[in-house]
Amino acid sequence: MASEASVRLGVPPGRLWIQRPGIYEDEEGRTWVTVVVRFNPSRREWARASQGSRYEPSITVHLWQMAVHTRELLSSGQMPFSQLPAVWQLYPGRKYRAADSSFWEIADHGQIDSMEQLVLTYQPERKD
């Protein structure tokens, strides 16, 4: 029973492919679910301030490695998945390179209760 409750942490997944909005699969066939997407500044603040601006918000994504059942899936309109990449490839220096060539830093790779968690942060280049 102890082995079921503990998560064996090693290196982060080498690659994550989108399966459905908010759902990714790694090279070992494990499912990763997007549980938090945070924009800084918030999407509302960004919309107010961005008229005529090219500034992009930073994005932080929390992914949990967990089994997914079809009936539990959220529709794509329920969470802001449209700004997440279709593919993340592990890159040297604790970061992922996305399909659009953007870089996402690994802010955390650890355990929350019995779930393996991967936290990625995108910091856009300032275009002032």
Swiss-Prot record:
One of its GO terms (molecular function) is protein serine/threonine kinase activator activity. InterPro entries: TCL1_MTCP1, TCL1_MTCP1_sf. Keywords: Chromosomal rearrangement, Proto-oncogene. Expressed in a variety of tissues including placenta and testis. Disulfide bonds: none annotated. Activated in chronic T-cell leukemias (T-CLL) carrying rearrangements of the 14q32.1 region. Belongs to the TCL1 family. Enhances the phosphorylation and activation of AKT1 and AKT2. Interacts with AKT1 and AKT2 (via PH domain). Does not interact with AKT3. This is T-cell leukemia/lymphoma protein 1B. It comes from Homo sapiens (Human).
